[in-house]
Amino acid sequence: MNTQLRSDALAAPMPDARGRFGIFGGRYVPETLVPALDRLQAGVARHLHSAEFQAEFLLELKTWVGRPTALSHAPTLSKRWGAEVWLKREDLAHTGAHKINNAVGQVLLAKRLGAKRVIAETGAGQHGVASAAAAARLGMPCVVYMGAVDVERQAPNVGRMQLLGAKVVPVTSGDATLRAAIDEALRDWVSDPDGTYYCLGSAVGPHPYPYLVRELQAVIGREARAQMLELAGALPDAVIACVGGGSNAIGLFHPFLADSAVQLLGVEAGGRGAGLGDNAASLTFGTPGVLQGSYTLILQDAFGQVRETHSVSAGLDYSGVGPEHAYLMQSGRVAYESAMDGEALDALAECARFEGILTAIESAHAFFGARRYAATHPGARILIGCSGRGDKDMPILQRTLLKDLAAERR
């Protein structure tokens, strides 16, 4: 069955006309949002792949974002792991993460659709920073909704958003993390669907967002594929990325889907363990359901109530996942596993100590997954998506890794 599904995944255009990836995806929203989503879908169809839009988008990526981002060989990790390790360096993009690719594209689209303001949600703060920066660049007001828990643990990014001119609104309802921030942004959009553009930060939500975000982020994988052929002389044996909502992973994976010899591996937030509420691994532990406008895999109880999640990483601390990831797992084309908090922090410390790269805690989950993969695939050529830099995580690292280091030195 999996072999046939893999073939279908490569042959069939996704999503279909209803915004479905197999059984996942679609659009489950209040009637008040249907006209806004219809306008967005029409705008995407009209503009996204037009020569004019692509020329402006690619120029912004080149001259402002700093693309293409580097592909770096990791010689010490390669030696330690017994593999050939390469890093796709989205941490080197303007604002410090992959989120800027999507934000620039969507704010350009917002202007073409006649929106007067941009709103966004954020977890780790990187999408908020990217949206604020893109809005400032293109002359639009910006409001960012952020869970109160994340406001506290990602304070540096809150200040960055404010300096970039955005209004940051802490959300105290629900679990006060990313899911609550998305809910609040959707409420704002419902109140003013004509004048407001919702710049959704991940490949989640109702159609056409999962498709739109994937198309804007696929520049990551297109660059990485060409760079691997140029610098490594071959495609990777495995491509590994962290997965929360899944935008950096789908952007990296998508251009490799047709390369059947390349294994694709997503690494979720395993948190404290397998118990409900102890992790944010919806592909590993979730069940099908509707979350924030999309049918996907979500962490819910036996009564269908979405449960709170836990991860040391704010950017992965989400109770669902993009519907295309749910489909790719079901199809067998992409494998998914999880890394626990301590495992991710250990991988972060290893990368910093031996490669001189302070990666984001989100990306550190992928680094741990890559180390685990290398242990069973000696000599493998591995490409890791370094989705962002770890500067934003210093408050968390002060309480965890640096505290442990200080204790060791006493």
Language-model segments: which ranges?
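Active-site/ligand-binding loops adjacent to catalytic centers
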Residues: 182-208, 212, 261, 266-357, ...
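Claisen-condensing/thiolase-fold acyl-transfer catalytic domains that form or cleave C-C bonds
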Residues: 243, 247, 341-405
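Glycine-rich ThDP/TPP pyrophosphate-binding loop and its adjacent helix/strand module
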Residues: 179-188, 195, 204-262
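A short, small-residue-rich loop immediately preceding and capping a beta-strand
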Residues: 94, 110-147, 235-248, 264-267, ...
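Active-site-proximal loop->helix
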Residues: 119, 127-185, 275-286, 394-402
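Positively charged, low-complexity intrinsically disordered leader regions
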Residues: 2-25, 38-115
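Short glycine/serine/threonine-rich phosphate/pyrophosphate-binding segments
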Residues: 96, 100-106, 117-138, 152-154, ...
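Active-site nucleophile and cofactor-binding loops and adjacent substrate-binding regions
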Residues: 89-102, 118-128, 174-175, 217, ...
